[in-house]
């Protein structure tokens, strides 16, 4: 089940809900770790994945390091970064996972700020290598995840389309209508 919305920059943004086989509904933490990572890979062993995490999956810098970050609300990160170090993945009492974020020595420098595992947005290594784009992967074992997805289906319009065109020297020239759907499908 999925929905695709268009954000203000005009690019498509997908929310995808994948249903697992019933035998996978209550996994062990190790099962979650096989699918989702919230750690910086070892650059010596997984250099390509390390570079993709650096490019696409690091949150911030924000907090005291950058109070002007867009995620900052009342001097706190609205996405709750940096997360806490956790030596193993656990599922809390509400059924939400707290991903493994060990305090290893792997770091990434972004805008002159050293970031560690506490700043990694959860990802799936296979999807990140294949699509080379930001893909926030979350383990959901709740009915609320279906409600979350339907919120986006029924969310109404919140988009802008802009186009830069050469200026018309003749102000009386008839402008041709713009077929935005065709432009999107042709790109």
Regions found by a protein language model. Give the residues of each.
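Extended, structured polyanion-binding interfaces
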Residues: 1-187
């Amino acid at each position: 089940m999925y929905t695709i919305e268009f954000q203000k920059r005009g690019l498509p943004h997908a929310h995808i809900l994948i249903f697992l086989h019933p035998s996978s509904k209550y996994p062990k933490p190790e099962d979650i770790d096989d699918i989702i990572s919230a750690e910086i890979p070892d650059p010596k062993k997984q250099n390509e994945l390390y570079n993709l995490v650096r490019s696409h999956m690091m949150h911030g810098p924000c907090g005291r390091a950058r109070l002007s970050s867009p995620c900052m609300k009342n001097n706190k990160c609205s996405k709750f970064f940096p997360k806490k170090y956790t030596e193993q993945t656990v599922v809390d009492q509400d059924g939400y996972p707290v991903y493994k974020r060990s305090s290893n020595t792997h770091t990434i420098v972004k805008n002159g700020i050293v970031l560690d595992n506490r700043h990694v947005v959860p990802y799936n290594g296979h999807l990140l290598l294949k699509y080379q784009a930001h893909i926030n992967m979350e383990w959901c074992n709740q009915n609320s995840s279906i409600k979350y997805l339907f919120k986006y289906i029924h969310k109404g319009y919140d988009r802008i389309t802009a186009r830069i065109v050469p200026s018309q020297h003749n102000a009386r020239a008839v402008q041709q209508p713009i077929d935005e759907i065709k432009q999107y499908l042709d790109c």
